From Swiss-Prot:
Residues 55-79, 174-196 have a biased composition (Low complexity). Residues 516-883 are annotated as: Interaction with LPXN. Residues 589-883 are annotated as: Interaction with KAT7. It comes from Eulemur fulvus collaris. This is Androgen receptor. There is a cross-link at residues 367, 485 (Glycyl lysine isopeptide (Lys-Gly) (interchain with G-Cter in SUMO)). Phosphorylated in prostate cancer cells in response to several growth factors including EGF. Phosphorylation is induced by c-Src kinase (CSK). Tyr-499 is one of the major phosphorylation sites and an increase in phosphorylation and Src kinase activity is associated with prostate cancer progression. Phosphorylation by TNK2 enhances the DNA-binding and transcriptional activity. Phosphorylation at Ser-61 by CDK9 regulates AR promoter selectivity and cell growth. Sumoylated on Lys-367 (major) and Lys-485. Ubiquitinated. Deubiquitinated by USP26. 'Lys-6' and 'Lys-27'-linked polyubiquitination by RNF6 modulates AR transcriptional activity and specificity. Keywords: Cytoplasm, DNA-binding, Isopeptide bond, Lipid-binding, Lipoprotein, Metal-binding, Nucleus, Palmitate, Phosphoprotein, Receptor, Steroid-binding, Transcription, Transcription regulation, Ubl conjugation, Zinc, Zinc-finger. GO terms for cellular component: chromatin; cytoplasm; nucleoplasm; nucleus. InterPro entries: Andrgn_rcpt (IPR001103), NHR-like_dom_sf (IPR035500), Nucl_hrmn_rcpt_lig-bd (IPR000536), Nuclear_hormone_rcpt_NR3 (IPR050200), Nuclear_hrmn_rcpt (IPR001723), Znf_hrmn_rcpt (IPR001628), Znf_NHR/GATA (IPR013088). Residues 197-207 have a biased composition (Polar residues). Residues 556-883 are annotated as: Interaction with CCAR1.
C-alpha cells in the first residue's frame, strides 16, 4: 500500500519495517532527502525501497550521474521538467559545492531551479524549492518551502502576517527568494556552458555518510515547534533504528482527528528557523517559547485568518498541498496490529507535554523516550517501546491500555523491561489484570509499589524492590494476645505453630528469601520471637519465660504508663512490663503449671513401675501429693490472672462543653456501652476455663450478662474515684444529681448509686471485687439450659470456691468467713434487679429512639433487640444465691 509522504514523495511501505511516532511522514521525507536522492518520476521512486536507492546512489560516480542525466532527453534543460524537488540541507559545503548543488540532476536529490519548478508546476505536482545556502541568515523557513510560485503567498491576509510576528518578515522572505532565483539561473547557465559536473554524492552529503548539521537542526526545529523533546535528537546516530520518531495520530476506531489550521505550525517553523543562531546548543532555545504560546492560543479558538482545504475557494486564505500531511491514515495496513494503542490528537501534542499530574483524558499522555536509556543491546527495540509511560513513575495518574499480565502486554504495545542486574519484570499498569497502584506506579503482579521517581536524569530506573508472585504466602504475625491456654486440655502437645503446615511451591530462588524454604518455626505467644518450648503452660521464648517467673513470684506491682494496650513484640517487649505480664496471663501462663507438669510426669512414672497394690504408706503419700497440688492452686495465682486481664479505662467520647440534654446524655451512654462491650468480650475470653465452654454457650453467657457486668464495674469505679457520691460511668461522663434527672432514668441511677455505696459499707477489697465480677458472668442462663450445661455448672462452682478461698485467706474464724460469704453473695444478687430495670429502660428507649433522637450503635441495637426480649419475657433468668 502506498502512503503519501510529507514533501510530496510516494513511498511504498516495505513489509519488514514499521514506523511509529509523531509526524512520521515529515521526518521520513527529510530522511529520504538526506540519504536517498531518488529519481525524478514517481514511478521510479516507487520501484525500489529507500535503502536500495541510497546504495545505488553511493555506487554511482559523479561522471556516470552526469552521463545518465544527459542521456535521458539529450538536453541539460531537461531538469526543468522534474516533478519533484528537494532541499539542500548541508550548510558546511564549500562554495563550489554550494553552487553545484543548485543545479538538479535526475539521480540526485538536489533542488531544481525556481524558474524551472514554476514551469513544471503546470502539469505535475508542485514541490518547494530551496533558497541559496550562501548566507546563514537565509535558512529556509516553512513559508519559503512553498516557493515563490505558491498562490497563497502573495495573497496572505494581514491576520496571518500578525501571527508571523510582523509584516516585514514576509517581505524579507520574498526578497530572498527573488535573489535566489536570479543567482541560481545565472550560475546554472554558466556551469552548463563550462560542462562542470552538477551533482555528486560528496557534494550532496558533504563528503560523509552522516546526517548534516542543517538536517539535524531542521529536525530539531520542527520537533521544538511541535512541542516534542529535543534531547533525543541530540544523541541520535544515523542508524534507522535509533530514530526517536513519535507518532501523534487519532485513536484507531475513534472519531477522526480535526486537522489544525496550517498557519500556526508555519508560524512556529518560521520563527524557530529564523531565530536559530549559528552556534547550536543541546538545549531548547528560549526563542521557541513565544511561538509555542501563540500557537496554543490559536488552538483555543483564535481566528488565524486562514483555513484548510474546505475553504480553498475563499480569497485571502493560505492553502497547503494535499500531500503535506502530518497525520497517519486510519486505513493503514498495520491498523489491525495496533488496536490497543492510544494515539493522541495533534493540537494537544503541539501544546507541549502537560504538567503533572496528568489529566484523565485518554489523549492526555505525551510519549517521550530516549534511545540511550536502553543501551546498545536495546538499539533495535528502542523505537518500538512507545508506551514507556514514564509519567506514571513520577506519581502521575495516567495508566496505559492493556492488562497487567506479561502476555497481555506483549499482545499490545506495552513492552517489558528488565534491569541488567536484577532481572526483575516491569510490566504495565494493568487495567484489568492486576491491582491498582496508590500513586499510579507500575504494578506487574497486582501489587502496589511505592511510588518513586527516576533514578537520574538519564532515565535509568531505580533498583527494583522484591516483588513476590501472587501465589506466595506471606508470613503471618504471631497470634492475637487473646489466645489463652486452656486449663482443661494439653493443647500445646499438638501445636503446629501459627503458620500451620505451609508449603511454598510457586516460589522462585531469586525472588524469595532463604527463610521461606525452611519449615515454619513456632513463635512465642508473648513477643513473637522464636519459641524455645512450653514454659509455665504456654509456648514462649526463653526471655518471656524468665520474665514471667520473676514478675509472678516477685512482690513488685507494675503499672502501665499508657492505656494498658502497649505493643509487645520482639523489639519492644521490655518497654512495658505491665502489659507484658498481662499478655503472659492472657496466654495462660501460671506458676503452678510447671509444678503440675512435673508431678504429672512423676505420677505416670510411678504408675508404670508399680504393678502391685499400693501400701498404706504409699496411699498416704499420694494423698499428701494431691493435697499439695490442691494447696498449690492457691488464690494468689488466680488473682494475678484476674488482675492482668482486667480492662482498662474506657472513655465515652462525650462533649462536656455542650449543654446537657436527654438525647446527648443517652447517646453518649449507648456509645460507652458498645465500647465497654468490646472489652467485656476480650476479658471473658481471657478468663480461666471460659474457652472450654461451647462456642454458643460463650456467646449466650456474654449477651445475657453484659448489663450486670457493666453496672457492677461502674459501681466499683464510683466507689474508688468519687466515693459513691456520683455515678462514674467514664472519665468524661460522670452523672451528678442534675444529669440523673436530665437523663429521665433517675430511679435507676439511684439504685446504681446505692450499689456503689454498698462497696464502701461492706469494705469490698479489690481481690473480692475481681472474683465477684468473674462469678457474675456465670449467673444468668436460659431456662432451657445451655448446650453443655454440666460443664457450665462445674465452671461456676469452681469460681464460687475461689471466692470462698479468697475470703478464707483473710479470715481465720470460720464464722466470720461464712458471714462474709453471705454478704458478698447478697451483693451479687442485688445486681440482677438493677440490670433487669435497665434492660427494660433500654428496650423502651430503642423503640422510641427515632422520636427522641437517641443514637444506638449497631452492636448495641442488635443485642437489645434480640437478646433483651428473652430476659424480659422470662426465657432467660438469673441464678440467685438466696431466695428472693
Amino acid at each position: 500500500m502506498e502512503v503519501q509522504l510529507g514533501l510530496g514523495r510516494v513511498y511504498p511501505r516495505p513489509p519488514s519495517k514499521t514506523y511509529r511516532g509523531a509526524f512520521q511522514n515529515l521526518f521520513q521525507s527529510v530522511r529520504e532527502v538526506i540519504q536517498n536522492p531518488g529519481p525524478r518520476h514517481p514511478e521510479a521512486a516507487s520501484a525500489a525501497p529507500p535503502g536500495a536507492r541510497l546504495q545505488q546512489q553511493q555506487e554511482t560516480s559523479p561522471p556516470q550521474q552526469q552521463q545518465q542525466q544527459q542521456g535521458e532527453d539529450g538536453s541539460p534543460q531537461a531538469q526543468s521538467r522534474g516533478p519533484t524537488g528537494y532541499l539542500a540541507l548541508d550548510e558546511e559545503q564549500q562554495p563550489s559545492q554550494q553552487q553545484s548543488a543548485l543545479e538538479c540532476h535526475p539521480e540526485s536529490g538536489c533542488v531544481p531551479e525556481p524558474g524551472a519548478a514554476a514551469a513544471a508546476s503546470k502539469g505535475l505536482q508542485q514541490q518547494p524549492p530551496a533558497p541559496s545556502d550562501e548566507d546563514d541568515s537565509a535558512v529556509p523557513s516553512t513559508l519559503s518551502l512553498l516557493g515563490p510560485t505558491f498562490p497563497g503567498l502573495s495573497s496572505c491576509s494581514a491576520d496571518l502576517k500578525d501571527i508571523l510576528s510582523e509584516a516585514g518578515t514576509m517581505q524579507l522572505l520574498q526578497q530572498q527568494q527573488q535573489e535566489a532565483v536570479s543567482e541560481g539561473s545565472s550560475s546554472g547557465r554558466a556551469r552548463e556552458a563550462a560542462g562542470a559536473p552538477t551533482s555528486s554524492k560528496d557534494s550532496y552529503l558533504g563528503g560523509t555518510s552522516t546526517i548534516s548539521d542543517s538536517a539535524k537542526e531542521l529536525c530539531k526545529a520542527v520537533s521544538v515547534s511541535m512541542g516534542l523533546g529535543v534531547e533525543t535528537l541530540e544523541h541520535l546516530s544515523p542508524g534507522e533504528q535509533l530514530r526517536g520518531d513519535c507518532m501523534y495520530a487519532p485513536l484507531l476506531g475513534g472519531p477522526p482527528a480535526v486537522r489544525p489550521t496550517p498557519c500556526a505550525p508555519l508560524a512556529e517553523c518560521k520563527g524557530s528557523l529564523l531565530d536559530d543562531s549559528a552556534d547550536k546548543g543541546t538545549e531548547e532555545p528560549a526563542e521557541y517559547t513565544p511561538f509555542k504560546g501563540s500557537y496554543t492560543q490559536g488552538l483555543e479558538g483564535e481566528s488565524l485568518g486562514c483555513s484548510g482545504s474546505s475553504e480553498a475557494g475563499s480569497s485571502g486564505t493560505l492553502e497547503l498541498p494535499s500531500t503535506l500531511s502530518l497525520y497517519k491514515s486510519g486505513a493503514l495496513e498495520e491498523a489491525a496490529s495496533y488496536q490497543s494503542r492510544d494515539y493522541y490528537n495533534f493540537p494537544l501534542a503541539l501544546a507541549g507535554p502537560p504538567p503533572p499530574p496528568l489529566p484523565p483524558h485518554p489523549h492526555a499522555r505525551i510519549k517521550l523516550e530516549n534511545p540511550l536509556d536502553y543501551g546498545s543491546s536495546w538499539a533495535a527495540a528502542a523505537a518500538q517501546c512507545r508506551f514507556g509511560d514514564l509519567a506514571s513513575l513520577h506519581g502521575g495518574g495516567a495508566t496505559g491500555p492493556g492488562s497487567g499480565s506479561p502476555s497481555a502486554a506483549a499482545a499490545s504495545s506495552w513492552h517489558t523491561l528488565f534491569t541488567a542486574e536484577e532481572g526483575q519484570l516491569y510490566g504495565p499498569c494493568g487495567g484489568g489484570g492486576g491491582g491498582t497502584s496508590e500513586a499510579g506506579a507500575v504494578t506487574p503482579y497486582g501489587y502496589s509499589r511505592p511510588p518513586q521517581g527516576l533514578a537520574g536524569q538519564e532515565g535509568d530506573f531505580p533498583a527494583p524492590d522484591v516483588w513476590y508472585p501472587s501465589g506466595v504466602v506471606s508470613r503471618v504475625p504471631y497470634p492475637s494476645p487473646s489466645c489463652v491456654k486452656s486449663e482443661m486440655g494439653p493443647w500445646m502437645e499438638s501445636y503446629s505453630g501459627p503458620y500451620g503446615d505451609v508449603r511454598l511451591e510457586t516460589a522462585r530462588d531469586h525472588v524469595l528469601p532463604i527463610d521461606y524454604y525452611f519449615p515454619p518455626q513456632k513463635t512465642c505467644l508473648i513477643c513473637g520471637d522464636e519459641a524455645s518450648g512450653c514454659h509455665y503452660g504456654a509456648l514462649t521464648c526463653g526471655s518471656c519465660k524468665v520474665f514471667f517467673k520473676r514478675a509472678a513470684e516477685g512482690k513488685q506491682k507494675y503499672l502501665c504508663a499508657s492505656r494498658n494496650d502497649c505493643t509487645i513484640d520482639k523489639f519492644r517487649r521490655k518497654n512495658c512490663p505491665s502489659c507484658r505480664l498481662r499478655k503472659c496471663y492472657e496466654a495462660g501462663m501460671t506458676l503452678g503449671a510447671r509444678k503440675l507438669k512435673k508431678l504429672g510426669n512423676l505420677k505416670l512414672q510411678e504408675e508404670g513401675e508399680a504393678s502391685s497394690a499400693t501400701s498404706p504408706t504409699e496411699e498416704s503419700s499420694q494423698k499428701l501429693t494431691v493435697s499439695h497440688i490442691e494447696g498449690y492452686e492457691c488464690q494468689p495465682i488466680f488473682l494475678n490472672v484476674l488482675e492482668a486481664i482486667e480492662p482498662g479505662v474506657v472513655c465515652a467520647g462525650h462533649d462536656n462543653n455542650q449543654p446537657d440534654s436527654f438525647a446527648a446524655l443517652l447517646s453518649s451512654l449507648n456509645e460507652l456501652g458498645e465500647r465497654q462491650l468490646v472489652h467485656v468480650v476480650k476479658w471473658a475470653k481471657a478468663l480461666p476455663g471460659f474457652r472450654n465452654l461451647h462456642v454458643d454457650d460463650q456467646m449466650a453467657v456474654i449477651q445475657y450478662s453484659w448489663m450486670g457486668l457493666m453496672v457492677f464495674a461502674m459501681g466499683w469505679r464510683s466507689f474508688t474515684n468519687v466515693n459513691s457520691r456520683m455515678l462514674y460511668f467514664a472519665p468524661d461522663l460522670v452523672f451528678n444529681e442534675y444529669r440523673m434527672h436530665k437523663s429521665r432514668m433517675y430511679s435507676q441511677c439511684v439504685r446504681m448509686r446505692h450499689l456503689s455505696q454498698e462497696f464502701g459499707w461492706l469494705q469490698i477489697t479489690p481481690q473480692e471485687f475481681l472474683c465477684m465480677k468473674a462469678l457474675l458472668l456465670f449467673s444468668i442462663i436460659p431456662v432451657d439450659g445451655l448446650k453443655n450445661q454440666k460443664f457450665f455448672d462445674e465452671l461456676r462452682m469452681n469460681y464460687i470456691k475461689e471466692l470462698d478461698r479468697i475470703i478464707a485467706c483473710k479470715r481465720k474464724n470460720p464464722t466470720s468467713c461464712s458471714r462474709r460469704f453471705y454478704q458478698l453473695t447478697k451483693l451479687l444478687d442485688s445486681v440482677q434487679p438493677i440490670a433487669r430495670e435497665l434492660h427494660q429502660f433500654t428496650f423502651d428507649l430503642l423503640i422510641k429512639s427515632h422520636m427522641v433522637s437517641v443514637d444506638f450503635p449497631e452492636m448495641m441495637a442488635e443485642i437489645i433487640s434480640v437478646q433483651v426480649p428473652k430476659i424480659l419475657s422470662g426465657k432467660v433468668k438469673p441464678i440467685y444465691f438466696h431466695t428472693q
